[in-house]
Amino acid sequence: MSYTYTLRYVFDPRTNTPEKDEKLLNFVQKAKIDDVAFIINGEELNHSHLTKEETQVWLDAIIPLQKQLAKLGVTTSLNPWTTIMHSDRGFSVNPKIGFNTFVDINGNKAKDMACPADPTWRKYLAQRYAQYASIHPRRLWMEDDFRHYNHTPLKLMCFCDYHMKLYQEKLDKDESREEFVKNMLKPGEPTIERKIYLDQARKEMIENEHLIEEAVHKVSPDTDMGQMTSFPDWHAIEGRDWAKLFDAQAGPGHPRVARPHLPAYNEVAPLIYGRKFEEYSHTTAAFLGPHAELYPELENSMWTPQVKSNTFIAFQIITTALL
């Protein structure tokens, strides 16, 4: 077993300074960091889905740092913070981008969160990932918003008009959204509606991964594609096929690469951590198999020194050996 230490680094290209760059480079050397993954358009800096021009602003700010890191023997990776989008966050899709948003199980339509089968969104996302690949990152990550469930405050997706047409074609009859959802959730033996929903959810995400993988490796053949994962029970709701999904993402000649959720954004009792580690991290590792490259995500929230002790952080790192 070997370890690679990746620093997931948040910065704002609009307010970045040479002094901040110097702090980054000094920290990387002091902490013996192997790889820096630049988070693009992340957290409070997020301003909806980026256009080509907006994306280039981030890449232009990263490229000089990439060159300086390379002189230190440190690789550069990219972590765009959104695919579908975690939640609307007060934004709407830029008309220049113009894809359709998803509709949840209750008929609520998102303002900024993509329909995962929308052809315009699929083309848009593949183009953006090809653009990210243009700087030849070591790894190119997809976020855990690449899922059908947990897009606050909306519920399970997608039941837009386009999806309803797909479902009805497979049913060979017309059903309203309400009727389809009611039958899909009916207790007892799984209904044909449930099978149709899960088959479509599973299929469209694998197709999306394949489109992105092709776009990336056409530009940067040596880049590994990786994906952050959420709780396995969330992914079970959409019928995730872990093997096919991650093989589609990896592409020929590349490993399955994942960033499993590592429990505890705040310090908790070791017993609680252990249970969640088994439930989330260890289960994810089992789904991905013994040859996958795993980069468990160690993160603190909120971002202050008071959230965790150094001892607890060291404890978390040690537990990753169990994966």
Question: Model-flagged regions — what are they?
Answer:
Residues 24-61, 84-108, 149-152, 156-158, ...:
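Aromatic-lined carbohydrate-binding/catalytic grooves of carbohydrate-active enzymes
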Residues 125, 132, 140, 216, ...:
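Conserved, mostly hydrophobic/aromatic
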Residues 17-26, 52-65, 121-126, 201-213, ...:
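Well-ordered, non-membrane alpha-helical segments in soluble/globular domains
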